[in-house]
Curated annotation (Swiss-Prot):
Lineage: Bacteria, Pseudomonadati, Chlorobiota, Chlorobiia, Chlorobiales
Keyword Ribosomal protein: yes
Polar residues biased stretches: 42-53
Pfam family of the protein (one): Ribosomal_L34
UniProt superkingdom: Bacteria
Annotated source species: Prosthecochloris aestuarii (strain DSM 271 / SK 413)
A GO cellular component entry from the record: ribosome
GO molecular-function term, one example from the UniProt record: structural constituent of ribosome
The protein's name in its UniProt record: Large ribosomal subunit protein bL34
Family matches, as Gene3D superfamilies: 1.10.287.3980
Sequence segments annotated as region (Disordered): 1-53
Length: 53
């Protein structure tokens, strides 16, 4: 049986990336709360470039 989670980086960035968060009011609220909490990474796309070496 095929599993439901089939990961793709493009889909991940498009749905949960920084630009997607900034596009909506609630997304900006998420970023603000993560900044207030002091999260190391605000969104998926902000951490995408740092992983590869």
């Amino acid at each position: 049986m095929k599993r439901t989670f089939q990961p793709h980086n493009r889909k991940r960035r498009n749905k949960h990336g920084f630009r997607a968060r900034m596009a909506t009011k609630n997304g900006r609220r998420i970023l603000a709360s993560r900044r207030a909490k002091g999260r190391h990474s605000l969104s998926v796309s902000s951490a995408m470039g740092t992983r590869k070496q």
